[in-house]
Amino acid sequence: MSRLDDIPSSPGKFKMEKSSYLHRLRFQSSLTKFAFFSFFLLCLISLLFLRSPPSINPSSPSDPSRRSLRTNTYGGPAWEKRLRSSARIRTSTNNGITVLVTGAAGFVGTHVSAALKRRGDGVIGLDNFNDYYDPSLKRARRALLERSGIFIVEGDINDVELLRKLFKIVSFTHVMHLAAQAGVRYAMENPSSYVHSNIAGFVNLLEICKSVNPQPAIVWASSSSVYGLNTKVPFSEKDKTDQPASLYAATKKAGEEIAHTYNHIYGLSLTGLRFFTVYGPWGRPDMAYFFFTKDILKGKSISIFESANHGTVARDFTYIDDIVKGCLAALDTAEKSTGSGGKKRGPAQLRVFNLGNTSPVPVSDLVRILERQLKVKAKKNLIKMPRNGDVPFTHANISLAQRELGYKPTTDLQTGLKKFVRWYLSYYSGDKKAAAR
C-alpha cells in the first residue's frame, strides 16, 4: 500500500466509512463516464487529424527547415572522445588551427575539411544531411572524411544546445561556416528554408561565437549572387549589391549585413567569401554541369538558357581546388576577434572577397566540353531564360583577393571538367575507391 493512502482526506478529523454497495455503484458510474469521455476524446482527435491538411506536400520536396531539427543522439564519453581526437592539431609547427566546419558533408565543406586535415589542423564537421539533394552522396563524402580522421557531427546550426556543447568541449580558434540552403531556383518552391538556414542559422552561430571566450575568427560563404541585377562587369567588392535577383541572393546579402552588425557590436572577426559557380568532383547534383552530365549519358534532352535577344548566358566557373585555396588563405589571414564575454574590446577585422576564375565561359561551351569528355552528343534544347532568379552573366574581379590572400586560380574549365567527368563515371559506376582518389 502506498504511503499516500494512509493520509486522511481531512487531516486531524475522523473519516466516516462509506457503504461498499454505494462505493461499487459510484465506481461503475465513474467507469462509464471515463469510457464515454475517452470515446468522445478519441473521436475528436480523429476528426481533427482527418481534417488537418498535410504539413508537407508529398509530391514536392520536403521542407529542409522541418527536417533539419530532428532529434539526433549526441553526448557521452565516447562522443566527446571522438570530438577531441578530431580537433587535435597534428602539425609540428606552432601555427595549427582548430576549425569547426559547418556544412562539412557538402561539396565545398568536404574539400575544405580534407585540405585542413591534410596539413595537420584540427577539424570538427557539422552537417544536418538534409535531402535537398541525395543524402547518400553526403554520407559518401562523410565516409571519405572519416577515413581521414575527421568526425562529422550530425546536427543543425539552429540547434543552439548542440552548438553550445561543441564549443564547451572544443576551443575552436576558427569557424568555417559553409552550411546553407543552396540553389537559386528552389527558393521559389520553398522560401522558408532559405530564411531558416541562411539567416536564422547564421545568427544562431554568431550568437554562440560572440559569447564564448576566446571568440573564434569566422570565415563564411557568401555568394556571387549578391551582385544580382548589376550590369557592370567584372563584379567588384566595391559594387552595389542592393538589387538581388532571387531570395537566395537576398538571404546571402542579409548575411553580409548581419556579419557587419556582429563585427561592429561584439568584435567578431568576420571574412565573407563570394563564390563564383563552383564545380568539380563530389559536386552538387543541382548544378548545371552535374545534371547535364547525367542527362547526356542517359540520352535525355538538356535545356540551355538564352538571355534576351538570343544573348549568351555565361558563368565564371571556378574549380573546387582553387576555391579551397582561397578558403584556407582566408582562414590563415583572419585576425583574432576582439570581444570577450559578449563585449567588444576593440576594432575587429571585417572583410569580403570575390573567389572566382575571372574567365566567364558560355554555357554552350560548357556543354561542348562535356560532349568531348563523355564522347556522347547532347540533345540540346535552347530556351529563353525564365524569371526564376538566374542572371545571364557572372564575372569576378579578384584583384582584392590576389592582393590580400595571394589567391590565384590555376584550373581552366576544360581541365576541371575532365577531372569531374572522371570522378562522376567512377562514382556512379559503383567504384567508390576510384572516386575517392
Swiss-Prot record:
The active site is at 248 (proton acceptor). GO terms for molecular function: UDP-glucuronate 4-epimerase activity. Its EC number is 5.1.3.6. Residues 56-76 are annotated as: Disordered. Activated by glycerol, not effected by dimethyl sulfoxide and inhibited by high concentration of monovalent salts, UDP-xylose, UDP-arabinose or UDP. The chain crosses the membrane at residues 30-50, 96-116. This is UDP-glucuronate 4-epimerase 4. Homodimer. GO terms for cellular component: Golgi cisterna membrane. It comes from Arabidopsis thaliana. It holds the Pfam family Epimerase. The gene is GAE4. The keyword NAD applies. Active between 20 and 55 degrees Celsius. It is found in: Golgi apparatus, Golgi stack membrane. In roots, leaves, siliques, flowers, pollen and stems. Optimum pH is 7.5. Active from pH 6.8 to 8.2.
